[in-house]
Amino acid sequence: VKLIHSYHKEAVFHRAFDITPNLEESIQTLISLHVDRVLTSGGEATAIKGQETIKYLQEHFGSHIEILAGCGINADNALEFKKYTHVKQLHSSCKSYKIDATTSNGKVSYGYYHDNEMKYEVVNCDQVSKLIHNTQ
């Protein structure tokens, strides 16, 4: 964290936080280390499932560390989620998939998915625009 801050950047802790045995103790540790932000789904598979915990973290620790809610957030649920939890930042992949035949030759594949070796993720600009529009 000191190294990151020495370059005038923010220290963000990723969702490894969500698998710690005690989220409250873990967030206090991150605060004591001067981490600026934590990406979390509230210790659940999605932020929607973890919204009670995220709301609690925001209410009790949000003035000391920024709570960045993510995993399962999209244009259709973002505004209600934001209003309920009072988080100021949301993380969303806004992804769709493209097919590129050049990613595989039958022996070697650079694709991400076993169901289709030629499929890869891209940011869907329409989803991003809708997310921004719906949360303004």
Predicted regions and their residues:
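Generic recognition of short, well-ordered alpha-helical segments
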Residues: E24-E25, K49-E52
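Active-site gating loops and adjacent loop-to-helix segments of metal-dependent hydrolytic enzymes
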Residues: G106-N116
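Glycine-rich phosphate-binding active-site loops on the catalytic face of alpha/beta enzymes
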Residues: V35-K49, T85-V108
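Catalytic beta/alpha-barrel core
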Residues: E10-P21, D36-A47, L68-G70
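Alpha-helix-loop-beta-strand connector modules within alpha/beta enzyme cores
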Residues: V1-F13, Q51-N74, D115-Q136
